[in-house]
Curated annotation (Swiss-Prot):
PANTHER family: LARGE RIBOSOMAL SUBUNIT PROTEIN UL2M, RIBOSOMAL PROTEIN L2
This protein's record includes keyword rRNA-binding: yes
Gene Ontology BP, a term: cytoplasmic translation
Pfam families linked: Ribosomal_L2, Ribosomal_L2_C
Cellular component terms (Gene Ontology): cytosolic large ribosomal subunit
Name of the protein: Large ribosomal subunit protein uL2
Coiled-coil parts of chain: none
Amino acid sequence: MALVKTKPTSPGRRFVVKVVHPELHKGDPYAPLVESKNRINSRNNQGRITVRRRGGGHKRNYRIIDFKRDKEGIEGKVERLEYDPNRSAHIALVLYPDGERRYIIAPKGVHKGSKVVSGREAPIRPGNCLPLQNIPLGATIHNIELKPGKGAQLVRSAGASAQLAAKEGIYAIIRMRSGETRKILAVCRACIGEVSNSEHNLRSLGKAGAKRWRGRRPTVRGVAMNPVDHPHGGGEGKTSGGRHPVSPTGKPTKGYKTRRNKRTSNMIIRDRRKK
């Protein structure tokens, strides 16, 4: 890994800072684990925008990632590390003795030739996957399941990690980077180590067009719009909106609680928003 600052040969390159990864595979991805991916540009089945500021961007193919890690006790060998346009983390292509290949989220410290294995008896080293009840306290983990057998849902982005803080009965207590502490069933699986590409946040895209390549459209303030487009729009000259901040649909924002799923609240011991 190396940070490279480009020469200011144009305004668009003046502020570019790239993260160079010479260890990544230069060729095409492994074809049997690649699917086509259609962009919906954040529209639902009615064609209405559900998430603003999305659309365009370069075409992508989806890499099928093994989030379940259910090849019990079979040691696999990492063939190569690859770039994945669909996530910030790198992915690793793992070859198993029976000839099957799978993509996994590449942990920090795993490289070409590394061995990874899943199971209760797996050694505690980066890339191995075990039930939380078999992981020692204080271990750094990622790729954490919320429901047994469903596959990893938490701690999957570049540089992310969590810590196994305690075990209480059928639950394991996990401390997240965000400050949240929560309970998860101890039979759920997690992988050892932290996710690769921790330098992802050090890059600088340098220009708006680089955001557009990634499918991100401009962010326009509500007070700069017309009344038909936003509750803060309109007015003579520059105005402050004339009311408490609201979303485009008129709901209060900046602190207004929108969370509905109350049934999991008893699993959260310490909220990430509370200092």
